[in-house]
């Protein structure tokens, strides 16, 4: 069955989630609009909840801005997602 795994042109859910999280790591000096941040939150929670039961009411997502060693402004999306249990 491992042979057929490489023939699929569709990305795995794991790869989709990884790609989405990469996109969220923002290298932008501008602010993220509230509605965009909410869309990101819903999409991340949708993907994660397929594999893990989470406490949706206690999820915290924020954007932290800092300066890197070269003096560039960087932004990072920080997510705190409490886990109830892992789906098997």
From Swiss-Prot:
Family recorded in the similarity comment: Belongs to the MinE family.
rRNA processing as UniProt keyword: no
Summary of the function given for this chain in its UniProt record: Prevents the cell division inhibition by proteins MinC and MinD at internal division sites while permitting inhibition at polar sites. This ensures cell division at the proper site by restricting the formation of a division septum at the midpoint of the long axis of the cell.
Classification via NCBIfam families: minE (TIGR01215)
Disulphide bridges: none
Alphabetic keyword roster: Cell cycle, Cell division
GO biological process: cell division; regulation of division septum assembly
InterPro entries reported in the protein's UniProt record: MinE, MinE_sf
Gene that specifies this protein: minE
HAMAP family membership: MinE
Entry protein name: Cell division topological specificity factor
Xref: SUPFAM superfamilies: Cell division protein MinE topological specificity domain
């Amino acid at each position: 069955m491992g042979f057929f795994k490489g023939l699929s042109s569709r990305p795995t859910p794991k790869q989709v989630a990884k790609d989405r999280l990469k996109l969220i790591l923002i290298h932008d000096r501008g602010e993220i609009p509230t509605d965009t941040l909410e869309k990101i939150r819903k999409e991340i929670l949708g993907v994660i909840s397929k594999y893990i039961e989470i406490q949706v009411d206690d999820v915290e997502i924020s954007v932290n801005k800092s300066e890197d060693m070269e003096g560039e402004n960087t932004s990072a999306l920080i997510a705190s997602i409490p886990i109830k249990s892992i789906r098997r």
